[in-house]
């Protein structure tokens, strides 16, 4: 279990309320696939991923990006028990999909970049970023739990 300060809880929940998951999700997953092209191997059923434009316009990428961000809502709702909230997803990504757990960190970085670009430095201040990155690190750890 993670010990969250009241300020961190407030920052995470407050920021989450400002994030358009249906906008950030597709952007973040597309960014991951463009910036870290080796991650594309996990999305072979998504169709054309041959260029950045193809990735950005790919409806399967957009749909899965939304799914990922809606999945993060589970962590926001379960701040005190993120690891258990993500047990089934961890098992699926480890045992069925064989996703390199470092890819979760890469996607978390892309989510952070997209949120920062959308909300700007006034809303996404350094202290908000610190809490959000701690939150994403806990989610990444929970997703990687079955790998250990």
From Swiss-Prot:
PANTHER family: HEMOGLOBIN FAMILY MEMBER, HEMOGLOBIN SUBUNIT BETA-1-RELATED. The lineage of its organism: Eukaryota, Metazoa, Chordata, Craniata, Vertebrata. Heme b binds at residues 64, 93. GO terms for molecular function: haptoglobin binding; heme binding; metal ion binding; organic acid binding; oxygen binding; oxygen carrier activity; peroxidase activity. Belongs to the globin family. One of its GO terms (cellular component) is haptoglobin-hemoglobin complex. Involved in oxygen transport from gills to the various peripheral tissues. This is Hemoglobin subunit beta. Residues 3-148 form the Globin domain. It comes from Salmo salar (Atlantic salmon). It comes from the Eukaryota. GO terms for biological process: hydrogen peroxide catabolic process. Keywords: Heme, Iron, Metal-binding, Oxygen transport, Transport. InterPro entries: Globin (IPR000971), Globin-like_sf (IPR009050), Globin/Proto (IPR012292), Hemoglobin_b (IPR002337), Hemoglobin_oxygen_transport (IPR050056). The gene is hbb. Heterotetramer of two alpha chains and two beta chains.
């Amino acid at each position: 279990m993670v010990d969250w300060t009241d300020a961190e809880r407030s920052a995470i929940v407050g920021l989450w309320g400002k994030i358009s998951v249906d906008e950030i999700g597709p952007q973040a997953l597309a960014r991951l696939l463009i910036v870290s092209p080796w991650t594309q191997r996990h999305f072979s059923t998504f169709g054309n991923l041959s260029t950045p434009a193809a990735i950005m316009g790919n409806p399967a990428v957009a749909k899965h990006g939304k799914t990922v961000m809606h999945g993060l809502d589970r962590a926001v709702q379960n701040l005190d028990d993120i690891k258990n909230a993500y047990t089934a997803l961890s098992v699926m990504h480890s045992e069925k999909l064989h996703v390199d757990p470092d890819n979760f960190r890469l996607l978390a970085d892309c989510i952070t970049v997209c949120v920062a670009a959308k909300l700007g430095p006034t809303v996404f201040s350094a202290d908000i970023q610190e809490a959000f990155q701690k939150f994403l690190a806990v989610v990444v750890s929970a997703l990687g739990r079955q790998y250990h």
